[in-house]
């Protein structure tokens, strides 16, 4: 089977936005116009094609990024729908890693919301070229120009409008196309009947001003166009498009479009822009990786986007499917792969057989015998592969850069209701943590309870909900708990000596360590400075293990210790009695003893909280934030409301949604995401230590 679409005619794009900016509706319309869906699904009816989990249809939000494929203008477009809720940043991070380009969807009224900022900066980190689509031009308070200003101020995105709206709110009738210098007026609500006309008189001046700005930006990427522009010569639409494409691919500018997906206005032009400005796999630099066993070498191995290169792909999502079992979504970066062949997972060091390959369309699927470079598909039969791992050809192994996932900040205890549920719960939680790296589970040694950890209350609610619906596990859920940690503030030296000698084989381990604090978020470092073999090499990993085990229970209140550097600099051993376990215990003793002397403190997660409230409730809401140990960073006006930016400890944020609702009579909204860990005040540390 040969390729259906050349690589240049492939687009791998994501649609990213704030919750409620209309992202799923926009995706729906794209699928409708590209002929994949014959009836439109509305998110607020709970009938949308992309939202195929029960929880999504009920809550009207998108949780798992479904990958879908469609075609437009002889080009294959693979779309990954990403969630806009802060608790699911991992899904966004995951999809950005495998995309080549993205559409940022903004609400014409809300503009650049806090979550859009987070996602935008995630995309900056991966150098993903973007176009922006200002949606909901038909709603009350829609303001295209305000959103463009916000993109400038908050995202430093260098927005370049290539369209302007004609009218707004109920009067939104059409779109000015600045590139062709014409206007499109829509005749009906299905968006299928429209006509191209001259730009309305009352808009000509504005259109000219914005067209000039656009040409000025485009001219920076094409010298010929620059000359024509300066000399006032005619410039063709194609020349403008190619120059803007150049700037967009370099992520130096963002073409801005507008429309109303719900009213079917502007979607086809958005599709054209995807093909005109966003990159094909051939436009992005070759993917880099390291050859297993040669990790220390400076030189990276490169794989060019071509079917003739050795096969390499990244598994970016694992889903448990009720019909086929474990589905592993992957993006092919080079080469091709046939169903039934073997791939190598260099991270696990295992060969696996790809049973079947499926191409997904939200929740309907097609079998593929072979997938090529640039394709996004799902494999059945990969039992050992986890999110973020590489798949490659066994003959030419490579490890592609993996993804970074944030640590979970909130935990709840969960208990099965019956004995039968107990067994099912363990396997179900295992499956869920395979799907989602920010969800972790462990058993509390003291209480024997199962503890689940995640990124926020909504995240854990969805998990518990899925246990019940998908896996039929009934469970009682405890109160959410904060993931406190401990660290040290002062450097110190410490000694650990473990000696048992009473007839027969004894035990002997003796270590001297230096402990010093690291900056927040640095984790743990272990340096071996042993010289002259005072501790034999084979025992050093045991010391490291002993210390890491001791770090699981801090000295103040038993929370995990973080951000510590350990240097092992001296010690001694006994020819006969020394062994690994003795050195492990000695390491652990040295760490516990040192921690007490190194000014230990308790840390708590601090959340970045942004609250939007009507002006009259501002005083009450700010008072409430202060009473929660919050620190207000700043305020700004936001179309009739006020936006309050603050940092509040997670411990004080439980149940905040209900409190805000009652304070503002349901008119306030807030978003919250993890920011950093900080020291707990003494009074609270005392409470935590007394528990």
From Swiss-Prot:
GTP binds at residues 17-24, 81-85, 135-138. The gene is fusA. InterPro entries: EFG_II, EFG_III, EFG_III/V, EFG_IV, EFG_V, EFG_V-like, EFTu-like_2, G_TR_CS. This is Elongation factor G. The keyword Nucleotide-binding applies. One of its GO terms (molecular function) is translation elongation factor activity. GO terms for cellular component: cytoplasm. It is found in: Cytoplasm. Keywords: Cytoplasm, Elongation factor, GTP-binding, Nucleotide-binding, Protein biosynthesis. Gene3D superfamilies: 3.30.230.10, 3.30.70.240, Elongation Factor G (Translational Gtpase), domain 3, P-loop containing nucleotide triphosphate hydrolases, Translation factors.
């Amino acid at each position: 089977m040969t390729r259906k679409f050349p690589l240049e005619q492939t687009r791998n794009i994501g649609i990213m936005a704030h919750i409620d900016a209309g992202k799923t509706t926009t995706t729906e319309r794209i699928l409708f116009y590209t002929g994949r869906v014959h009836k439109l699904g509305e998110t607020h009816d709970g009938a949308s094609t992309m939202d195929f989990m029960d929880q999504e249809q009920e809550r009207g939000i998108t949780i798992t990024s479904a990958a879908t494929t469609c075609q437009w203008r002889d080009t294959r477009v693979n779309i990954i729908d990403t969630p806009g809720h802060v608790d699911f940043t991992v899904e966004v991070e995951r999809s950005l890693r495998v995309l080549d380009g993205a559409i940022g969807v903004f609400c014409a009224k809300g503009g650049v919301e806090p979550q859009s900022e987070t996602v935008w900066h995630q995309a900056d980190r991966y150098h993903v070229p973007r176009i922006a689509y200002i949606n909901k031009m038909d709603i009350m308070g829609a303001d295209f120009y305000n959103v463009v200003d916000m993109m400038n101020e908050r995202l430093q995105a260098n927005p370049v409008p290539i369209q302007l709206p004609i009218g707004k709110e109920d009067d939104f009738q059409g779109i000015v196309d600045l590139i062709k210098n014409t206007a499109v007026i829509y005749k009906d609500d299905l968006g299928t009947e429209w006509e191209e006309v001259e730009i309305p008189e009352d808009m000509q001046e504005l259109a000219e001003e914005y067209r000039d700005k656009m040409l000025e930006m485009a001219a920076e990427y094409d010298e010929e166009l620059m000359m024509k522009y300066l000399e006032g010569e005619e410039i063709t639409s194609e020349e403008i498009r190619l120059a803007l494409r150049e700037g967009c691919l370099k992520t130096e500018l963002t073409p801005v479009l507008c429309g109303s997906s719900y009213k079917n206005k502007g979607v086809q032009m958005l599709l054209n822009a995807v093909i005109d400005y966003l990159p094909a796999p051939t436009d992005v630099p070759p993917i880099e990786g390291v050859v297993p066993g040669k990790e220390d070498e400076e030189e990276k191995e490169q794989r060019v986007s071509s079917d003739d290169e050795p096969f390499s792909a990244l598994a970016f999502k694992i889903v448990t499917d009720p019909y086929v079992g474990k589905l592993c979504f992957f993006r092919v970066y080079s080469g091709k792969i046939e169903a039934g062949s073997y791939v190598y997972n260099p991270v696990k060091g295992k060969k696996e057989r790809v049973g079947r390959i499926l191409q997904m369309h939200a929740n309907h699927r097609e079998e593929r015998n072979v997938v090529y470079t640039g394709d996004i598909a799902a494999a059945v039969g990969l039992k050992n592969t986890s999110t973020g791992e590489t798949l490659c050809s066994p003959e030419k192994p490579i490890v592609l850069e993996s993804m970074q996932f944030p640590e979970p900040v909130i935990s709840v205890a969960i208990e099965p209701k019956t004995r039968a549920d107990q067994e099912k719960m363990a396997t179900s939680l295992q499956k869920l943590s395979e799907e989602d790296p920010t969800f972790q589970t462990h058993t509390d040694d003291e209480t024997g309870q199962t503890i689940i950890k995640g990124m926020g209350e909504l995240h854990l609610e969805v998990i518990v909900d899925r246990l019940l619906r998908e896996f039929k596990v009934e469970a009682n859920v405890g109160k959410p708990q904060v993931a406190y940690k401990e660290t040290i503030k002062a450097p110190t030296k410490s000694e650990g000596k473990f000696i048992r000698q009473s007839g027969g084989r004894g035990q002997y381990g003796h270590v001297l360590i230096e402990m010093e604090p690291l900056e927040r978020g640095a984790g743990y470092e272990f340096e071996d400075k042993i010289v002259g073999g005072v501790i034999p090499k084979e025992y050093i990993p045991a010391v490291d293990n002993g210390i890491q085990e001791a770090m699981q229970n801090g000295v103040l209140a038993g929370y995990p210790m973080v951000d510590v550097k350990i240097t092992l600099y001296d010690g001694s051993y006994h020819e006969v009695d020394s062994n690994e376990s003795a050195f492990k215990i000695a390491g652990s003793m040295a760490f516990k003893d040192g921690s007490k002397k190194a000014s230990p403190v308790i840390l708590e997660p601090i959340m970045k909280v942004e609250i939007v409230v009507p002006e009259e409730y501002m005083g009450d809401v700010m008072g409430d934030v202060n009473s929660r140990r919050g620190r207000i960073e700043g305020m700004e006006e936001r179309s009739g409301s006020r936006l309050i930016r603050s940092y509040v400890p997670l411990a004080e944020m439980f149940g905040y949604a209900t409190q805000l609702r009652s304070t503002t009579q349901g008119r306030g909204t807030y978003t919250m995401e993890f920011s950093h860990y900080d020291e707990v005040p003494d009074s609270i540390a005392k409470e935590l230590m007394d528990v």
